[in-house]
């Protein structure tokens, strides 16, 4: 079930529902992918799930399957990076629902550091970490915090418009950095990469938003 971390929020009902004062509510369940290889830099790396990550994903899939009437998920949306795809596929297979991949819900593009061993990244790019970047400062051949925020916020706005007419719920499989931005948008808070964000667990429902 949704754990203590879960953020519950109302994003906004479709216009026709607001005009007629009809209570049309569907939910978006947002999860971070299962555990992947922590010995390399993540971002746009195409690392696979670890054995534990697969186990975590199967556990969530079982929970969603056993409580289908409660969750009522008819479609999964996912980042197209491998660790998210694997997580989404495990759940989709269990629930027998389709997946749509959205590349704009990828983690931050960390350019040259993507998939690089941690020790090598520290050697080549000492002390280069997400929270230390300035707003307009890029990862080498990658994104700046400003660009990452713009990409995700635009994708989220488009996503909400696309699903707002659904009468069943959807699941979004994405990444920690993306979830941090989405929660700021939902809560109406200013986003900064320098914020100390709460650690988001793997393969558990992190956000439950009503539309």
Roles of regions detected by a PLM:
Residues 28, 74, 165-176:
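Generic beta-sheet signal
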Residues 28, 32-98:
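Active-site-proximal alpha-helix that buttresses catalytic centers in soluble enzyme cores
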Residues 2-14:
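Extreme N-terminal basic, low-complexity initiation segments
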Residues 67-72, 159-168:
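Glycine-rich phosphate-binding loop signature in dinucleotide/nucleotide-binding domains
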Residues 48, 94-154:
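Phosphate-handling substructures
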Residues 176-180, 204:
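GST superfamily/GST-like fold recognition
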Residues 15-25:
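Short, Lys/Arg-enriched N-terminal segments with co-localized hydrophobic residues
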Residues 187-211:
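Domain-level recognition of soluble alpha/beta enzyme cores
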């Amino acid at each position: 079930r949704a754990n203590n971390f879960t953020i519950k929020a109302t994003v906004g009902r479709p216009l026709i529902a607001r005009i007629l004062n009809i209570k049309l509510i569907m939910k978006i369940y947002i999860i971070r992918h299962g555990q992947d290889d922590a010995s390399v830099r993540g971002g746009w790396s195409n690392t696979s799930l670890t054995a534990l990550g697969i186990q975590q994903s199967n556990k969530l899939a079982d929970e969603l399957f056993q409580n289908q009437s409660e969750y009522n998920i008819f479609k999964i949306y996912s980042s197209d990076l491998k660790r998210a795809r694997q997580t989404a596929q495990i759940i989709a297979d269990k629930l027998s629902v389709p997946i749509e991949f959205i590349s704009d819900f990828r983690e931050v593009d960390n350019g040259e550091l993507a998939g690089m061993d941690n020790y090598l990244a520290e050697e080549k790019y000492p002390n280069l970490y997400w929270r230390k970047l300035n707003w307009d400062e890029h990862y080498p051949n990658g994104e700046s915090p400003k660009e990452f925020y713009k990409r995700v916020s635009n994708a989220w706005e488009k996503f909400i418009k696309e699903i707002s007419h659904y009468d069943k719920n959807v699941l979004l499989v994405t990444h920690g950095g993306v979830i941090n931005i989405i929660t700021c948008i939902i809560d109406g808070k200013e986003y900064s990469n320098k914020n100390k964000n709460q650690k988001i667990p793997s393969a558990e429902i992190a956000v439950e938003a009503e539309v």
